[in-house]
Amino acid sequence: HFVSAMGTTGTITGVSRYLREKNPKVRIIGAQPAEGSRIPGIRKWPLEYQPKIYDPAAVDEEILVDQVEAEEMARRLAREEGIFAGISSGGAAWVAQQVAAREQGATIVFVVCDRGDRYLSTGVFPA
């Protein structure tokens, strides 16, 4: 399983193509913001405005992540794993964790797609 935040959709589309060349059975899962969530770097594109690079067939499933869950996971990544990642990476990690809970024994990879230093002035990472 491969999990990625879906911003411009370039990463998830490109990685999907590459991984499926190697293993057509790989599952590609996108992290999308839940209704009302404002997660920098993740965007739920209206159908008429989807990026031209995006191939809907490249993604098997989209899982919604709430802003609070994404921010908390970004803090956990920093505190518990030493990975200073941003909020969209926190969202992807949260989705990966949900997939891991339901797919016992599966190999799951997610992309850390942004840095935490961009959010130091926002209060996401308290001192």
Residue ranges and their predicted role:
Residues 1-26, 101:
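Glycine-rich ThDP/TPP pyrophosphate-binding loop and its adjacent helix/strand module
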Residues 20-87, 102, 123-127:
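Active-site/ligand-binding loops adjacent to catalytic centers
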Residues 7-10, 32-37, 46, 67, ...:
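Glycine-rich beta-alpha junction loops
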Residues 1-3, 27-34, 106-113:
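Beta-strand segments within the central parallel beta-sheet cores of soluble alpha/beta enzyme folds
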Residues 49, 83, 95-98, 117:
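Short, surface-exposed, charged/polar-biased interaction segments
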Residues 16, 75, 96-100:
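Generic structural signal for well-ordered alpha-helical scaffold segments
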Residues 97-127:
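Phosphate-binding loop/pocket of nucleotide- and phosphate-handling active sites
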Residues 5-15, 88-96, 119:
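Short glycine/serine/threonine-rich phosphate/pyrophosphate-binding segments
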